[in-house]
Design a protein with these regions (language model features):
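Metal-cofactor-dependent catalytic cores
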Residues: 27-295
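Compositionally biased, intrinsically disordered low-complexity regions used as flexible
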Residues: 14-15, 46
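Short, Lys/Arg-enriched N-terminal segments with co-localized hydrophobic residues
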Residues: 15-30
Length: 295
């Protein structure tokens, strides 16, 4: 079940609900409007609101997010999050770019082998800690207590739970951005728009602008991996923050509504069949008939 996304999430716009599976007469008929596309880049975000981390490749597991994507969050005031019974919480409970744009001024890195999380500011290391130990989490919490006091509603606390992701939606999905749609937004804004404003997992090159909205209900094939496109992503004020300068320099949701009649960009997809995907891999649409034959 999909939970509302704080200040962003809503139902899929009626004008996009017709993007279900396309029926074809036979397996020989080409899938209409199926342009060649590939994965341009892959990113994860180990701590919600903090730095994107590029991945050359990643192993996907059915029904899960990217490994360690939004694995941690920084609680901003009591959330009653229970690590023994983790449940979706709206982003308002955490430090986040929608309200706390200064987060983008930090350069952070999470090391999978050691669970060490490092924070740099202006190229200088300012905090480091093991996020799987109480002492290490305290080191990171102390940094935010000192440096983000004006943003805090209570003591900052690093939250995590096995298998849980602090995503903006309750379902475990991956997010996909069409780079041509970002280019269309850039044209409307009249100035460069860094695709990382959208904090997606898979960035796709080759689709026409807004083509992703026609894929709702379709299954994407990336080698042996299968992804089911589930839902448009509604955008909020987080995309107004430049990921390099940390300045809130644009009002992209307003620009999108004015120029395109919506504030959606990208889609969520569920991992149906797992495997490894890499930057440069081609993306195809699996026909409904082939899906039935393989089921």
């Amino acid at each position: 079940m999909w939970e509302p996304e704080f200040a962003c999430e809503r139902g899929t716009p009626e004008k996009f609900t017709a993007g279900g599976a396309i029926k074809r007469k036979s397996l020989e008929d080409p899938m209409p409007n199926n342009p060649s596309a590939k994965i341009a880049s892959i990113y994860r975000y180990p701590v919600k609101g903090l730095s994107p981390e590029p991945l050359p490749s990643v192993k996907l597991t059915p029904g899960q997010t990217l490994p360690s994507d939004r694995r941690y969050a920084i609680e901003n005031g009591p959330s009653k999050f229970d690590p023994d019974n983790p449940k979706y919480l709206p982003k308002a409970y955490f430090l986040m770019l929608m309200r706390n744009e200064r987060l983008a001024s930090l350069q952070t890195h999470f090391d999978d082998a050691t669970n060490i999380f490092t924070i740099r500011h202006n190229g200088r290391e300012v905090a480091q800690g093991n996020l799987e130990t109480a002492e290490g989490r305290a080191d990171i919490e102390d940094y935010f207590r000192r440096e983000f006091s004006s943003d805090l509603k209570g003591a900052p606390k690093i939250l995590t739970a096995p298998g849980h992701s602090f995503s903006d939606v309750s379902a475990k999905v991956v997010s996909i951005i069409n780079l041509a749609s970002v280019a269309a937004i850039e044209g409307a804004a009249g100035q460069p728009v860094d695709p990382l404003r959208f904090r997606s997992n898979l960035y796709v090159d080759g689709w026409p602008g807004w083509h992703e909205f026609s894929l709702l209900g379709e299954t994407l094939a990336i080698g042996d991996v299968r992804l089911k496109v589930k839902k448009n992503i509604v955008r909020c004020a987080a995309i107004n923050v430049d990921p390099v300068t940390a300045e809130r320099d644009l009002n992209l949701p307003k620009t999108m509504v004015q120029h395109f009649g919506h504030d959606d960009c990208g889609v969520y997809a569920e991992i149906i069949t797992g495997g490894t995907v890499a930057a440069g891999d081609m993306i195809e649409i699996v026909s409904p008939e082939l899906q039935l034959q393989s089921s």
